[in-house]
Amino acid sequence: MTTKKLILDLDMGVDDAMALAYAIASPEVELVGITTCFGNVRVEQSAHNCLAVLDLLGRPEVPVYLGADRPLQATEPYTPPASTALIHGKNGIGGASVPASPYEPVGATSVDGNAAVDYLIDAARTYGPDLVYVATGPLSNLALALERDAAAMMSIGRVVVMGGALTVPGNVSAGAEANMASDPEAADAVLRSGRKLTMVGLDVTHRVVLTRRDIAGWTGSGTMAGCAFASMVEHYIGSYEMNAPYLGGCALHDPLAVAVAIDPTLVGALGCNLRVDLLGEYRGRTICDERRLSDPDKSALVALTVDAPRFLSEFKTRMARVLG
């Protein structure tokens, strides 16, 4: 079996950290780089969180690239709303105390350009069909890369995005999911580009839930990584207990996206062509594009069912492996 190259595009909140850990624990892929975006935190915080968690998990050599610091149409850098800090903590990783990495993200000393987009295009040209790209935040970096070099981006073997909601309500408005709503223009550009991708949205991520009982062993491991991740996720579960107690734990949004990138058989998907509403009360909603309903070539696979027991078993096994 050929090991695929993996790039994660993260807005480094708590579930992003779990997705990163899942990727590191997965022998099917080689994590070659991380690109960062605004979202759960400002992009600079996202990058430094990535570096700190990589160091914590024994992978400090993985490069981290600074990406988009704002939505495509914004004139000022993005600042997360106060509600986001309640979910992910002020530092984005549940307030957990994780030692800072001695390294800096690529692009930290540059005032021009977007290091993440530069890297993504170079990686697409280098690895082509052997590259897997997973975006777990706003799609700003992907949209910019498609605009700059569509041919390179079309050559990537697999693209998976965590975001959207097709058959269930949104989580920031009646119709919109947070990642898509953070930069609707970017999401719409990606979904209309023709680039084939799999959308892992709220339709399935709210069906894979982690409980306090599930993470009890992380603290019991006695490792720094286990204790840090337990602290992060305890905060995250607490936010769900306040805002969505009916779930019984926290949704594993981003880890599921990484898992599906590795093993697409975890989900059942509907092929369709998507767009994003850009105006009015439904701004940020992902929906089938009425103008392309009869187009036989479907650019998106939307995950609508998930083998939750199998995924949760894999998640617990891999997290135990990486957290000690």
Task: Show where each model-derived region lies.
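Short, surface-exposed amphipathic charged segments that create phosphate/polyanion-binding patches used
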Residues: Y78-L86, S173-E177, I215
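Conformational coupling and interaction surfaces
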Residues: T2-T3, Y22-A23, E30, A181-E185, ...
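Active-site histidine-anchored catalytic micro-motif
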Residues: T2-A52, P60, G95-H206, R212
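Short, glycine/acidic-enriched capping/hinge loops at junctions between secondary-structure elements
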Residues: M18-L20, S46, T75-P77, V172, ...
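A residue-level signal for conserved active-site and pocket-lining positions in enzyme catalytic cores
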Residues: V64, V190, V258
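Histidine-centered active-site/metal-ligand motif
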Residues: D16, H88-K90, N141, H253
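Metal-dependent C-N hydrolase catalytic cores
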Residues: A47-T126, K298-D307, F311-E314, A320
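Acidic/polar N-terminal loop/beta-strand segments that form early-domain functional surfaces
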Residues: T36-G39, G67-D69, L279
